[in-house]
Curated annotation (Swiss-Prot):
Pathway annotation: Glycolipid biosynthesis; lipid IV(A) biosynthesis; lipid IV(A) from (3R)-3-hydroxytetradecanoyl-[acyl-carrier-protein] and UDP-N-acetyl-alpha-D-glucosamine: step 1/6
Lineage: Bacteria, Pseudomonadati, Pseudomonadota, Gammaproteobacteria, Pasteurellales
Family of the protein in this entry: Belongs to the transferase hexapeptide repeat family. LpxA subfamily.
Designated gene of the protein: lpxA
Pfam families in the record: Acetyltransf_11, Hexapep
Name assigned to this protein: Acyl-[acyl-carrier-protein]--UDP-N-acetylglucosamine O-acyltransferase
């Protein structure tokens, strides 16, 4: 079903069954598969392929040569009807690839709202990207990676399968990340190591001085003491009772399966 207000270039191919919403623009030489649903106000500029069971929300901007919802690269994948779900107001730049999920990984690659994926970035099967994240040029996420809100991944970085990156993390360019990265941390290197709290990013997002002070203290407990994480966790839980932003640390450590960067 194609909304009457949608604008589709004569050279674009929209397969029968696709749902094209109000005021959608589909530019030259795009290919839209039969199981694709594109929401109100989304713009596909040109030469874009959207395939599989793919849902794209409202007011997204998608640039040339992006590939969304294509079959993933997991060797176990055998054409099962898995999905790609994308929220609203995302900017997906040139040559970005976003692959559909796998049955073993939950069946969905899921992206939230207000994200920016720069040129040549790759999002593999079963990834979960929440809101307001940035992938710089050539950043690569392996399968099953999760990015919490406000994560910035520097250019040419790569994140290992199943890694979780906490909210407000900033990863420097060229980082190789093989373990979970706690919230609020800056990290860089091969393999990535922590080098402080993302203070400037937190200030821009309205964190007040007492909260920043509490986050710094927790960072010092984790990274600048001789105690193990199990030993410092009760202390962090006490701080979290007084400051809800610290509860991110507690929740993160309890769900971590790969261990945290050191």
């Amino acid at each position: 079903m194609i909304h009457p207000s949608a604008k589709i270039h004569p050279t674009a191919i929209v397969e029968e069954g696709a749902k094209i919403g109000e005021n959608v623009i589909i530019g030259p030489f795009c290919l839209i598969g039969a199981d694709v649903d594109i929401g109100k106000g989304t713009v596909l500029h040109s030469h874009i392929v959207v395939k599989g069971i793919t849902r794209i929300g409202e007011d997204n901007q998608i640039y040339q040569f992006a590939s969304i919802g294509e079959a993933n690269q997991d060797l176990k994948y055998n054409g099962e009807p898995t999905k790609t779900i994308i929220g609203d107001r995302n900017r997906i730049r040139e040559s970005v690839t976003i692959h559909r999920g796998t049955v073993q990984g939950g069946g969905v690659t899921r992206i939230g709202d207000d994200n920016l994926f720069m040129i040549n970035s790759h999002i593999a099967h079963d990834c979960i990207i929440k809101n307001r994240c940035i992938l710089a040029n050539n950043a690569t996420l392996a399968g099953h990676v999760q990015l919490d809100d406000f994560v910035i991944v520097g250019g040419m970085s790569a994140i290992h399968q199943f890694v979780v990156v906490g909210a407000h993390v900033m990863l420097g360019g060229g980082s190789m990340v093989s373990q979970d990265v706690p919230p609020y941390v800056m990290a860089q290197g091969n393999h990535a190591r922590p080098f402080g709290v993302n203070i400037e990013g937190l200030k821009r997002r309205g964190f007040d001085k007492p909260t920043l002070h509490a986050i710094r203290n927790v960072y010092k407990l984790i990274y600048r003491s001789d105690k193990t994480l199990d030993e410092v966790l009760p202390e962090i839980e006490q701080v979290a009772q007084k400051d809800s932003s610290i509860s991110f640390f507690v929740e993160f450590f309890k769900r971590s399966t790969r261990g945290i960067i050191r």
